[in-house]
């Protein structure tokens, strides 16, 4: 389960009545969408605006305007590089290219206290891997959608003391399956989506929930992606 944001590109791999079966261009995630929520463009256009020339919005909530002065709501991380193809215009702030690692923390702070939503990728609702994916994507680094996929990237760190802010910590269940991810902050704190986007402590055991005063997740691995 996931969400598409404004400007996300995908290819149609099947159709059933009014539904499109799609695969997203950036992370090969598959699912179904209503055909009314899509605008068809060429493969070359999709490759350009969806991968090569992305420009992401940086405001939590913003608007894009049509030629008829109608406003469409945008959330942070919307890719407006293809707005002209839809005869729409946007004049707000955007970010393009790869940012420095410390910029990840600035972006992460914008999602703080967003409610948890399985499959969500916006400040109105987001899950743990959607949070880390969007933080990295907005700053120019594409990582997969799911926590287990993200854990396959980067270099493995043996101890928290070897990490730096912006690295990712992954957590598993009793069967050893990775089920959770969070963004490491300074001084052994971690930002993650659990009920809401929150900041808790982290140690070699896992995440220590500051509200319940007990560990909520078991640490499996720490990865340095950039």
Question: Language-model segments: what does each one mean?
Answer:
Residues 8, 78, 166-167, 188:
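Structural motif
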Residues 162-174:
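Hydrophobic/aromatic-rich core segments of domains that either
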Residues 116-165:
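Catalytic cysteine-centered active-site loop
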Residues 2, 6, 16, 24-114:
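Boundary regions of SH3-family modules and the immediately adjacent low-complexity/disordered segments
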Residues 22-23, 180-185:
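Short beta-strand-centered aromatic/proline hotspots
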Residues 40, 157, 185-226:
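Aromatic- and glycine-rich peptidoglycan recognition patches
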Residues 121, 172-180, 193-199:
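Active-site loop architecture of trypsin-fold serine endopeptidases
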């Amino acid at each position: 389960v996931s969400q598409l944001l404004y400007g996300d590109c995908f290819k149609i791999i099947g159709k059933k009545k009014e539904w499109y079966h799609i695969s997203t261009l950036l992370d090969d995630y598959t699912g179904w969408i209503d055909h009314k929520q899509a605008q068809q463009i060429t493969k070359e256009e999709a490759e350009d605006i969806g991968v090569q020339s992305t420009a992401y919005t940086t405001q939590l909530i913003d608007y894009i305007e049509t030629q008829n002065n109608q406003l469409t709501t945008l959330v942070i991380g919307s890719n407006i590089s293809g707005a002209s193809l839809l005869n729409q215009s946007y004049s707000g702030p955007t970010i393009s290219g790869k940012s420095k690692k410390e910029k990840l923390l600035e972006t992460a702070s914008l999602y703080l206290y967003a409610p948890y939503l399985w499959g969500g990728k916006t400040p109105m609702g987001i899950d743990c891997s959607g949070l880390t994916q969007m933080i990295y994507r907005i700053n120019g680094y594409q990582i997969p959608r799911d926590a287990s996929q993200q854990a396959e990237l980067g270099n493995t760190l043996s101890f928290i003391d070897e990490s730096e802010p912006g690295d990712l910590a992954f957590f598993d269940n009793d069967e050893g399956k990775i089920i959770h991810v969070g963004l490491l902050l300074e001084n052994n704190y971690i930002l993650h989506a659990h009920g809401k986007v929150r900041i808790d402590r982290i140690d070699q055991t896992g995440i220590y929930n500051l509200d319940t005063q007990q560990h909520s997740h078991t640490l499996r691995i720490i990865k340095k992606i950039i």
